[in-house]
Amino acid sequence: MAPKAGYFTPLLHVMDVRRSIRFYELLGFDLIDLEGDPACPGWARMHCEGGAVMFLLAEEPFDPTKHALLTAMYAPDLPAFREHLLANGVAVPAITYPGYMPSGSLSLRDPDGYIIDIHHWSDAEHTAWLNNVEQKKKDGVLPSSRYSRTQLQSYPIRDTL
């Protein structure tokens, strides 16, 4: 068997690690590890259900809008999640209903300017996605994988929040 890597985790350069921790806690992340001075850490790792993120203190100012990074998260109740963020002082736009995510989506920026798309993932969309994956496998568009339909039932957030 060929060696492989696993557990892909974005590492974001940030201007203030503590500020990023506070913001990502509002998104449901838990602080897992911290390096450096606890008052002004140089690195942190946070986990949420189904994902992780790390922060590295930037040595000089940078423009995150020039980085080609877009993150996506899923919420089982996007309107309630939006209200939670608003109640905690986060500037959150209205929910939109684009064709690729008809049950709702919003985009916001974290304190360093990184874009975070948050999508409502409904039962109907999840079932349609599972059916689409199965059909692509039958049509030979996707290879058979080690992930069965049952294993994919829990992706991305089914019954975990």
Which residues does each PLM region occupy?
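Core segments of cupin and vicinal oxygen chelate
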Residues: A2-K4, L11-V53
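Residue-level structural signal for beta-strand termini and adjacent loop
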Residues: D37, A58-E59, H119-W121
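A short beta-turn/loop motif at secondary-structure boundaries
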Residues: D37-P38, P61-D63, P98-Y100
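A sequence-level detector of short linear motifs
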Residues: M54-F55, D117
